[in-house]
């Protein structure tokens, strides 16, 4: 029994010595920065402990960029998600989605991304919701987001949603709507992503009639309408071609 006690005491002392050594090294890591420190001389366990300890210290200091770098090197999913939660609670959804996506690369667990995406919708951050659902490959939520964006007149995001979904029918329908409402930039974007040459040429005709020659030329080029491209280039000056839609 006495020998067992001695053995336990020895193990505890070794553990404390190890922790003491780590605590002495961590400040040096913090000072140099994760990108500039070399920990190759340590075994994997010690190296990971050092990096995790450094990551915790960075979090305390509010330096989440360095903290993320630390936890990425140790593939510490839990700690990465904690940082994502901090960003999300502050309304910094761009950063939250980025960190959750890094965690997702290791875990393949979509829950954090989906929860963040839904929170983004509630708070009107539709582009961030698009990123979250796209990374999670959640088609159902992307479809719903597209409809919400149409309802809220967030046309730019709606176009990108339908682009991710590769829904050419929705893109063309939305492009037609934008064309009818004289929102020509959005119409051009929708038709271009849908890769519909006929619609692009029709838009080019509208732009030409409106005197927006620079935009008309660009759209005809996208439509591979060589006849109209040649017509514009041979009949109008460079100054005239400087007119674009807003």
What are these regions (language model features)?
Residues 1-246:
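Long, low-complexity, acidic Ser/Pro- and Gly-enriched intrinsically disordered regions
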């Amino acid at each position: 029994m006495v020998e067992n006690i001695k053995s336990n005491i020895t193990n505890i002392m070794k553990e404390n010595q190890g922790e003491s050594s780590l605590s002495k090294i961590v400040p040096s890591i913090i000072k140099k920065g994760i990108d500039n420190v070399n920990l190759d001389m340590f075994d994997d366990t010690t190296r990971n402990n050092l990096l995790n300890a450094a990551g915790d210290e960075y979090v305390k200091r509010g330096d989440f960029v360095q903290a993320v770098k630390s936890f990425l090197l140790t593939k510490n999913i839990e700690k990465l998600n904690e940082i994502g939660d901090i960003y999300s609670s502050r309304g910094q959804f761009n950063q939250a989605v980025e960190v959750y996506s890094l965690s997702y690369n290791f875990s393949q667990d979509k829950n954090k991304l989906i929860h963040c995406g839904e929170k983004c919708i509630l708070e009107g951050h539709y582009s961030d919701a698009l990123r979250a659902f796209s990374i999670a490959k959640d088609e159902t939520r992307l479809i719903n987001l597209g409809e919400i964006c149409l309802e809220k007149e967030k046309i730019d995001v709606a176009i990108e949603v339908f682009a991710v979904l590769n829904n050419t029918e929705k893109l063309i329908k939305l492009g037609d709507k934008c064309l009818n409402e004289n929102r020509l930039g959005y119409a051009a974007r929708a038709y271009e992503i849908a890769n519909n040459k006929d619609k692009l040429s029709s838009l080019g005709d509208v732009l030409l009639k409106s005197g927006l020659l620079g935009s008309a030329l660009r759209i005809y080029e996208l439509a591979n309408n060589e006849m109209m491209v040649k017509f514009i280039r041979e009949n109008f000056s460079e100054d005239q071609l400087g007119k674009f839609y807003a």
